[in-house]
Amino acid sequence: MSTLLSSLSKTVHASLALAIVLFLGLFYLNDGIAIDTLFWSWLFRYIHVIVAIMWIGLLWYFNFVQIPNMGKIPDEQKPAIGKVIAPAALFYFRWAAAITVLSGLILAYLNGYLHDAMTLSIGSGVPKHTAIGIGMWLGIIMAFNVWFVIWPNQKRALGMVETDPETKAKSAKTAMLFSRTNTLLSLPMLLTMVIAQNLY
């Protein structure tokens, strides 16, 4: 067990294998598997939830753990964060954001409410689609912030792109402010997603 848990790759593969075994067991208890729209909808919802947890988890890690504690780290130790931990976290952060939005759009399409949600149900007046639509737009805005504001500014702030010290400091502040904007939007976004799935 120690060998399995000492390797992240082995741990993730074992988790995936366990999930597949559970999936097969539960579906066989339900008279087998039909690879139909319901199956694909379930699969994309599962993917959507997993990558959304990673995305928002990293967003909250940056805002609740890393940013508030950077001032407490001695200057000689800061390169460990800026050169190693932050770039790795930002890789998963930005790709989780992209896959969350993409899987959410596919899920909405498979369930037949993509257009209704994207137009906030104007014209049809379906409250569930209005709620999920608000959540989708908030998620799209947040993902846009990740890819087109936070990431470019973080590259300058972390020294991944050469720039002068003044631009580096300005970029760090801009990245932080947009990260905080995403934190501000995260609870309303999650609220509308949960409302759409559970109140209607």
Task: Walk through the language-model features, giving the residues of each.
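Polytopic transmembrane helical bundles with strong interfacial aromatic enrichment
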Residues: 1-200
